[in-house]
């Protein structure tokens, strides 16, 4: 088959849109992929400054929660090598994905997409993922996360990905209230983002 992309304007004769170096504020009603420069430019730049792993992970999660794909450009040198900054960035992304890829691969957007510091994704099997974006320098976490207007079955469980930690939750009028354990806060603050799986 043939896939057609117009880099400038969405239209009836193309398959998906490619916002360049930006992320739409809300989900788009057609397939899309944000094309983001990791550092320097589209081609190799000497002494390029690369985005942090945290910035790249937050960008990825935000895009996926809005139903898009991320194309992250990492340009090689004339010798076909990457800078140390590029390797560091990709290693940080890889380490995070090794724990939390379940919240990214094979997921779809789900309203409200994002609330506070939390992005929402879901899978066809009913799994819902809340990814809390930890900001640089953040020193504390909320004691609870309120998933607005969400009313799960009483039998569902909430669990932190990468751990066996089950989280207590209650149902209130404004949504599902998930408790964050105090004894996990130091570990969670040391990550770029952590994921709560609801199923």
Residue ranges and their predicted role:
Residues 1-199:
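Mature catalytic domains of secreted/periplasmic carbohydrate-active enzymes
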């Amino acid at each position: 088959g043939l896939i057609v992309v117009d880099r400038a304007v969405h239209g009836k004769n193309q398959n998906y849109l490619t916002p360049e170096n930006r992320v739409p504020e809300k989900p788009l009603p057609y397939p899309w992929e944000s094309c983001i420069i990791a550092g320097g430019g589209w081609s190799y730049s000497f002494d390029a400054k690369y985005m942090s792993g945290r910035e790249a992970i937050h960008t990825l999660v935000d895009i996926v929660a809005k139903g898009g794909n991320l194309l992250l450009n990492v340009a090689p040198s004339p010798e076909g090598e990457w800078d140390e900054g590029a390797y560091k960035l990709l290693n940080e992304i890889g380490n995070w994905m090794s724990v939390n890829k379940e919240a990214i691969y094979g997921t779809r957007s789900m309203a409200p997409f994002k609330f506070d510091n939390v992005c929402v994704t879901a899978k066809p099997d009913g799994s819902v993922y809340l990814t809390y974006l930890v900001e640089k320098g953040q020193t504390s976490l909320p004691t609870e996360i309120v998933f607005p207007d969400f009313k799960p079955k009483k039998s569902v469980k909430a669990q932190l990905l990468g751990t066996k930690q089950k989280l207590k939750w209650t149902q209130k009028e404004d949504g599902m209230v998930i408790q964050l354990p105090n004894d996990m806060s130091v570990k969670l603050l040391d990550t770029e983002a952590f994921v709560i799986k609801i199923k």
